[in-house]
Amino acid sequence: IIDDSADITLAVNSIIHSKTFDNGMICASEQSVIVLEKIYDAVKEEFANRGCYFLNEEETEKVRKTIIINGALNAKIVGQKAAKIAALAGVTVPEGTKILIGEVESVELSEEFAHEKLSPVLAMYKATDIEDAFSKAEHLIADGGYGHTSSIYLDIAKEQDKLKEFS
C-alpha cells in the first residue's frame, strides 16, 4: 500500500528494487501495489520515469493470459526479464523495461494479476481511501496465502493511527 502521506520516490524505488532483484523470483517481492487515488497519477508517473512499462488494456489482456496457464503460474515467466515476458505475450516494450505493470481492479482469484507472479510483473490497484486499500490488501493476502505479507509506505511521524490499524 502506498498511502498519500508516503514519500513517493522512496516507495517506488523500494518496490522497483524488490521486483528487479533476481527478476522478482523472491516470494517476498511485491506482487501488487495498492495506491490511494489522491496520489495514483504521481505514483504512476514515478514508476514510468524509472523504466517501468504500463500495459494498455489490450496488452494487459495478453500478459494476463501469459501469467496463468491452465490454472497455474506459467513457469516460462518465472525469473525472466520484463522484455522476455512481454515478448512471450506478444507485447512490444521499450528496451530496458524493468517491470510490466497491469492496472487492474479485481482482487479476486479470477484476476491473473492478483496471483503471485515470481517475475517483474506487477498489478497496480487504485484505492479510494485507506480503508479500501486495507480491504484490497487483506483480500489479496487471504487468496494468496497467509504465509505472505503486506507492507505500507506512509509518513510514520504523521500517520501512527493508520500504521496501528494496518498492523
Residue ranges and their predicted role:
Residues 91-167:
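Conserved C-terminal structural/oligomerization subdomain of aldehyde/semialdehyde dehydrogenase
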Residues 1-108, 133-135:
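ALDH superfamily catalytic-core signature
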